[in-house]
């Protein structure tokens, strides 16, 4: 069964890799080197050469750059934009047929996964609202929804706004706790702050 990708976007986080792709026997016949790399990956013996054989959409080379395989089970680790896919994304972490790169192997063998991530072995639903796809991934894991904030630091403007809002809240709390006896200490209204920011 062919898995034609819905997009060929590098690091697309809204892909569930539910399509199993060509059967193992087909893969063995058509792509014997790739199958051998996957077998080595199962026992943590993959090499940099295997990484090149498997490739990815982002690399624009190898098995996982081909439309037929790009969003198949074999490519769930290398083509997923999910942060820490090897740690907490079931189609990658919970699938022995998903090739893990040497870098992903090292993260797992050295136990470098962040604490607090839930590894979902069965995902009932994977997806989310496209307009917040840069910020959130929602995993429905046995009816428990775990939301991970991802890629925030890749959006400096959003990070700056969050920091400004936090500082304003802290300043307000501090000025209100001091009794507000001095009118000079009062924070100007937010509309004035933002109008002053526009002057820069």
UniProtKB/Swiss-Prot annotation:
Glycan attachment positions: 131
Transmembrane regions: 150-170
Main localization of the protein described in the UniProt heading: virion
GO biological-process terms attached to the record: symbiont-mediated activation of host autophagy
Keywords: Activation of host autophagy by virus, Disulfide bond, Glycoprotein, Host membrane, Host-virus interaction, Late protein, Membrane, Transmembrane, Transmembrane helix, Virion
Domain of life: Viruses
Gene Ontology cellular component terms for the protein in this record: host cell membrane; membrane; virion membrane
Inducers of expression: Expressed in the late phase of the viral replicative cycle.
Post-translational modification: Contains intramolecular disulfide bonds.
Membrane topology note: Single-pass membrane protein
Annotated compartments: Virion membrane; Host membrane
Oligomeric form and interacting partners: Interacts with host PYCR2; this interaction results in autophagy activation.
Family, similarity comment: Belongs to the asfivirus E199L family.
Protein task: Essential for viral fusion with host endosomal membrane and core release. Not required for virus morphogenesis and egress. Induces complete autophagy through the interaction with and down-regulation of host PYCR2.
Record's protein name: Inner membrane protein E199L
Native species: African swine fever virus (isolate Warthog/Namibia/Wart80/1980)
């Amino acid at each position: 069964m062919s898995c034609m990708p819905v997009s060929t976007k590098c690091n697309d986080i809204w892909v569930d890799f539910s399509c199993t792709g060509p059967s193992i026997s087909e893969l063995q016949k058509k792509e014997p080197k790739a199958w051998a790399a996957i077998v080595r990956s199962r026992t943590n013996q993959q090499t940099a050469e295997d990484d090149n054989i498997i490739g990815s959409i982002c690399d624009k080379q190898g098995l996982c750059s081909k439309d037929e395989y790009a969003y198949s089970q074999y490519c769930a680790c290398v083509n997923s934009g999910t942060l820490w896919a090897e740690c907490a994304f079931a189609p990658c972490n919970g699938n022995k047929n998903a090739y893990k790169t040497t870098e992903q192997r090292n993260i797992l063998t050295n136990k470098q996964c962040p604490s607090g991530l839930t590894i979902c072995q069965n995902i009932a639903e994977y997806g989310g609202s496209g307009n917040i796809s840069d910020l959130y991934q929602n995993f429905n894991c046995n009816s428990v929804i775990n939301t991970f904030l991802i890629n925030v630091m890749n959006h400096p403007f959003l990070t700056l706004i969050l920091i400004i809002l936090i500082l304003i809240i802290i300043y307000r709390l501090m000025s209100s706790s001091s009794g507000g006896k001095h009118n000079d200490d009062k924070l100007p209204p937010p509309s004035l702050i933002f109008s002053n920011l526009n002057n820069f």
